[in-house]
């Protein structure tokens, strides 16, 4: 079900999709930019969250500056009957931020479930891989390491 965003909603989302104002009163500053009151902005954001039109509202932290310097995308060989249970168990791990199921159409690529693992060292990431293997029926996997970050931005939905 899609949500038709009003001009007022779009105005607020256009501002918050970039960055919140760096001040002691970010919502008041945001309201001023949008031509609204702070109460109106808070009500609008609360309504959008409650309706499911926005999933979450929070800070993006530069993980490298907090010591989380390693990550690994792990591709797992999974059967269709394993996906829900194994995906749920993997998602419970605190070092895993994303779990996706993507059916493969490539005959030489048997991996269909992907987890994004974060750690403070390569050994910590590898330990998470072992934890997933121990707590699920998943065994066969491929670890895809990033060689270079080419782009990392948040999506812009309203311009």
UniProtKB/Swiss-Prot annotation:
GO molecular-function terms, A-Z: lyase activity
Pathway involvement of the protein, from the record: Porphyrin-containing compound metabolism; protoheme biosynthesis
Claim: rRNA processing is one of the keywords in the record: no
Pfam families linked: AsnC_trans_reg2 (PF17805), NirdL-like_HTH (PF22451)
Keyword set, alphabetical order: Heme biosynthesis, Lyase
Catalysed reactions, as listed in the record: siroheme + 2 H(+) = 12,18-didecarboxysiroheme + 2 CO2
E.C. designation(s): 4.1.1.111
S-S bridge residues: none
Ion transport found in the keyword field: no
BP-aspect Gene Ontology terms: heme biosynthetic process
Binding site for substrate: 152-157
Function: Involved in siroheme-dependent heme b biosynthesis. Catalyzes the decarboxylation of siroheme into didecarboxysiroheme. Siroheme is decarboxylated to monodecarboxysiroheme, which is in turn decarboxylated to didecarboxysiroheme.
Family: Belongs to the Ahb/Nir family.
Quaternary context: Forms a heterodimer composed of AhbA and AhbB.
Official protein name in the record: Siroheme decarboxylase beta subunit
Classification lineage: Bacteria, Pseudomonadati, Thermodesulfobacteriota, Desulfovibrionia, Desulfovibrionales
